[in-house]
């Protein structure tokens, strides 16, 4: 049920996205996320969707595999859609039954919000799928570097963010194992009232928390055994350098800003 979660995983490769500098990818993700929230009409969202699909092709990864990153949040997206259809009012009334109405603004907001969530998750998945944990950590550290001058532990922050991303598929896999084990013991997570289903989650939550703390402790012990000192005196075999690929990323970023700004109403 939870296997093959794409977000948080890294798939080695030699594609354009794999070989681009992690700093340029991180900066582009921030810019793209901003553009997602600035988009407010069909044309701007169509442009962003088209670009996301093209980026997926550039990664040379299976599109179906990338789309699996939406699996863990499809319930959240569905809930958001229903919530906006019920609450947001305005415009043409499409359907009415007593006090309940489905109106133009509600449908519009439901579609746009679900697209925002989906695009954010997909573009974030492309980042982790095409960037190794080491490169991602170093890229974050280099971008946050100026904060180190005022005493902020930049390396530790970058490492924590990288580990948090990489723990997502691990915890999802652990959740899947626990669900299968509880199902084998007779637990039922697919039927019954909402309250009963919530109670059935307790046998999953407790072992999952225990497993998460155990894995965190094992990771801490492994880092300590290898002499981890927070990046003090650390050297690097391969230093990050900007290439022509990053120039293309910069040009594409400028073009996207201009196009979205032009079509935004």
Swiss-Prot record:
Localization per record: Cell membrane
Major subcellular location class: membrane
UniProt entry tagged with the keyword Cell membrane: yes
Keyword annotations from UniProtKB, A to Z: Cell membrane, Membrane, Transmembrane, Transmembrane helix, Transport
Membrane disposition: Multi-pass membrane protein
Protein name: Energy-coupling factor transporter transmembrane protein EcfT
Job description of the protein: Transmembrane (T) component of an energy-coupling factor (ECF) ABC-transporter complex. Unlike classic ABC transporters this ECF transporter provides the energy necessary to transport a number of different substrates.
GO molecular function, one term: transmembrane transporter activity
Family, similarity comment: Belongs to the energy-coupling factor EcfT family.
Source domain of life: Bacteria
Gene: ecfT
TM region positions: 29-49, 73-93, 110-130, 143-163, 242-262
Annotated Pfam families: CbiQ
Subunit structure: Forms a stable energy-coupling factor (ECF) transporter complex composed of 2 membrane-embedded substrate-binding proteins (S component), 2 ATP-binding proteins (A component) and 2 transmembrane proteins (T component). May be able to interact with more than 1 S component at a time.
GO-annotated cellular components: plasma membrane
Family annotation (InterPro entries): ABC/ECF_trnsptr_transmembrane, EcfT
